[in-house]
Amino acid sequence: MTFIVTYIRRERRKWGLTQREVARLIGVTSSAHVSALERGITRPSAEVLLALQMLFGMTAAQLFPQVVQRAQAKVMTEAAAMLDDPIPTMSLRTQRKHTLLRQIPSRAIMS
């Protein structure tokens, strides 16, 4: 099992919230789910991540830095590989795709 760095516990305690209160605020059924998120045992769904961002006023990169770094690295590696794929002719669609792939590094979240 891979553990991930998370700052949920720090933020929850900073604001004086219990795990049960955070669970209620972010729409999960139990404090056990919040505990698993805090310990880095489980990753949040997109909905839970958005709720945590709203609750604590922090970005995904601030709450889950390792997850964001891994996702960015994967996308950038695959984008670079796709740009290196041999292309006999550049259709308009392929040109648009290459434009998108070249822009990916500038979209990375710097932490």
Region locations from a protein language model:
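Short, charged recognition helix plus adjacent turn
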Residues: 54, 64-111
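A short, Lys/Arg-rich alpha-helix, primarily the initiator
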Residues: 1-14, 106, 111
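Residues in the recognition helix of alpha-helical DNA-binding motifs
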Residues: 11, 25, 36-37, 66
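Helix-turn-helix DNA-binding elements, focusing on the entry/boundary residues of the two helices
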Residues: 8, 19, 31, 46-49
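Recognition helix of helix-turn-helix/homeodomain-like DNA-binding domains
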Residues: 27-44
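The short coil/loop that forms the "turn" connecting the two helices of the helix-turn-helix
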Residues: 17, 28-29, 58
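DNA major-groove recognition helix of helix-turn-helix/homeodomain DNA-binding modules
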Residues: 47-62
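Short basic helix-loop element that most often maps to the first helix and adjoining turn
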Residues: 6-25, 76-87
